[in-house]
């Protein structure tokens, strides 16, 4: 023990001499540091047993022939064994399996706190950097044997020390460092304290974190490493991104992407949910059909959304009608148009070529609608015809209206039609029964069925919009506010979301009724919106509150689905209006056209309107602003149609223009 104690002052003197060469300290500071270091070294806790100190080096004769490692100093093992046994008893005991266990040494408590990188009972997650260790080994080998022993001894002590002792050691070292050494320390630590938390965390938590990123940040995260890329490109993350942006406006970034057809299988979505929960998928749960990754879907939709935003599109013009085009509809491959020339034409969208012409009506085709098997058209000859549009055959003809048929809409079981005779007829495809809805005081220009709620919406030249109960034939409610003939009504998809503002309160100045003049007609047989006797009656009362019938029909007790919450209307007063159906409030009025609005189409992201002013406009429903105006027609735009990546307009100039926003 005396020999061990005799080496300590010599070693401390050498350390202090080295520090004096590296840094200039005042005598007071050196004295204060010496006083603070020596008690720490003379504590029994530092020596391992009472009254014993750890030796910093053995004699060169006893150690020169033994191999040395960077983190394992054999000559000093016997001297620091009590220290190692005290603080990492389990690890040290494994190296000295025959050493007796001292029951007097304190045991580690179950709630002992360690940093996660150096817990003695866990494998450290951070591995040593091999190039750095090799360089340290080479640098150490250039020193003398005594210096190697001293440094290795210090490293062994530090490695064995608990967190509190390590902090004290580091504080003492940092206190003696000069600026170059502190700079070296800062540069070395900068990279060491970086933790790859995404890889360290369970996958489901990493997915949750990445789902909060925007697309740009997510793409940047994918460039960090292979493991980050695997997580950032996973379907779980991009499915969440698609849910936030596709077919709706994201509240964070304001972007909304058009909806693709909903043909993705439900079991694939279930796979995404299982992966997000960190669960494995059984082999028998694999979908039978392969689908595009959600990232690819998002990329495709993002390109289309960007083209919509900046107006980047290609235009195809369909020419063939000999008179103005009054109605149109299209799907992925087929375009159908109806005209003043009493014909219906079927077009191939990709080639722009006419496929066939349907002839049979004796007057203007005012409305049409088609699905996979049939096309139904309405004409001013007072008839409705059902066609096999693939073969061109007229299957049946419906008669019953006393005036020209101006509008129609059908679902799987029911057809609704509006006419010049001021009535709406409901036709049942199965039992051939009909019902007449009466209440409008003028031409019925637009009808729309809502199958879920069993209701029908109608717009009329009497300046009102009505909602009807299909089961009873009664008018549920009437909406007034337009000061021109209402040409279109469109219930919006239930997915449509509108953030109500304080200025969305009921505007009583909008709820005005105007006098009617039966002698002023527009170019389509409608009354002109420039009729001199159509002055607002400012003394007219606002529309009455929601009728008790509406509340009685669509309560939770009845179990009947309510109609869509919002609807859109267009009129010859130059405006579009967005309504809240169940309250009757006009939430927003869209101004921009300089003549009456004839055509209207909408989805959850945008509205499209066509007007007498030869223009078609695209609107942002949430801000009320006109995003883009399309020109090119040489006559009034009478009809418009809309899909996720296309828009079509028909005009009295006999042309149809198709705008494609596909990437």
From Swiss-Prot:
TM segments? none
- The region called Disordered is annotated at 1-80, 503-547
Residue stretches of biased makeup (Polar residues): 1-15, 56-77, 526-541
Query: Which residues does the UniProt record annotate as the domain F-box?
Result: 195-241
State the WD repeat positions.
Answer: 320-359, 361-399, 400-437, 439-480, 544-589, 592-629, 632-663
Annotated InterPro entries: F-box-like_dom_sf, F-box_dom, G-protein_beta_WD-40_rep, Quinoprotein_ADH-like_sf, SCF_subunit_WD-repeat, WD40/YVTN_repeat-like_dom_sf, WD40_repeat_CS, WD40_rpt
**GO biological process terms, semicolon-separated:** protein ubiquitination
Q: Does the keyword Repeat apply?
A: yes
Q: In which pathway does it act?
A: Protein modification; protein ubiquitination
Which CDD domains would you find in this protein's record? F-box_SpPof1-like, WD40
Keywords on record: Repeat, Transcription, Transcription regulation, Ubl conjugation pathway, WD repeat
**A Pfam family in this protein?**
WD40
Which domain of life does this protein belong to? Eukaryota
Q: Where is the composition biased (Basic and acidic residues)?
A: 503-522
- Is Nucleotide-binding tagged as a keyword? no
Quaternary structure annotation from Swiss-Prot or TrEMBL: Component of the SCF(sconB) E3 ubiquitin ligase complex.
Record function comment:
Component of the SCF(sconB) E3 ubiquitin ligase complex involved in the regulation of sulfur metabolite repression, probably by mediating the inactivation or degradation of the metR transcription factor.
For this chain, the family text in UniProt reads: Belongs to the WD repeat MET30/SCONB/SCON-2 family.
- The identity of this protein, by name, is Probable E3 ubiquitin ligase complex SCF subunit sconB
Q: From which organism does this entry originate?
A: Arthroderma benhamiae (strain ATCC MYA-4681 / CBS 112371) (Trichophyton mentagrophytes)
Its lineage reads:
Eukaryota, Fungi, Dikarya, Ascomycota, Pezizomycotina
